[in-house]
Amino acid sequence: MEAKRADKTFPMKSPELCRELGAYLLGKHPHLRVNVHEPQLEIMVEIRDKGAYIHGPKVEAAGGLPVGTSGRALNLLSGGIDSPVAAYCMARRGLALHHIHFASPPYTSLRAKLKVRALARELAEYTGNCQLFVVPYTKPQEYIRDNAPDVLFTVLMRRSMLRIAKLVADQSEMEALITGESLAQVASQTMQAIACTDAAQNLPILRPLIGMDKTEIIAISRKIGTFDTSIEPYEDCCTIFTPPHPKTKPSLAEIEAAEAGMPGLAELERIAAETVEKIPIRIGDDPEF
């Protein structure tokens, strides 16, 4: 037995209440035995001002804070293992989440888009109903490929995506961006590359996986049920046009110089942000379009 008095005016103190209730139960069920160290069954009693709550064992849930109590954020959902786990981690800290995905047809397929929608649907079990914003990213991505130094392509693309994500976030009154980056996991996630991507826009970027290794991230992915969907073999836009030897320690000066040589990029980003497809994600809906 465990007792708690939310109503301190109740005449019996918690230990006394436990003794009385325990004696009552043993009187009704004499085959029971008391084991305070390793009980097979715990009964909880909570005294309130207008009654009492009685319940059995606690069932562990996700924990954390109620969704929505810490603000609103936009999660960059690529379709891989990391970004769904990042969304889950931040939802546990009370953020109300929406997702943004960058699609580059014909280089990326409809199946890749369906995969991301399925991931958003699986995450809705933890985050609640949300919106999935699908950005038509083909033209900005081709423009960067055709006009920028090959070794800087990945960081320039990440900066472009963050600028578009900020435009979408501002339109929907979201206060931060979320990414699934883990320090030094790939070339675009070194300290220098992250510093360059951070400088692209001014919304806070939350990176809950930054200190985790892949084994830890995969374990969470399996736990929340997104792993099997994440490993489906449909290519997303982050893996196309990838240079064989990207620069791992770019400087902000050379990144900004490369962007100065792409005067048409800002307009392409604006158009992409204004033509996003908005897909409502509801708990219990069909994962297919």
Regions of interest found by a model, annotated:
Residues 1-74, 84-130, 139, 199, ...:
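RNA-binding accessory domains that recognize and position tRNA/RNA substrates
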Residues 20-25, 31, 58-70, 137, ...:
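Active-site adenylate/phosphate-handling loop in enzymes that bind or generate adenylated species
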Residues 55-57, 100-102, 135-138, 179-180, ...:
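Generic beta-strand/beta-sheet core signal
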Residues 80:
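Conserved G/P- and acidic residue-centered "switch" motifs that form tight phosphate/ATP-binding loops
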Residues 185, 233-241:
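Small/polar glycine-rich anion-binding or flexible loop at a beta-alpha turn
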Residues 225-233:
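A short alpha-helix-loop-beta-strand transition element characteristic
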Residues 259-260, 264:
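Trafficking entry modules
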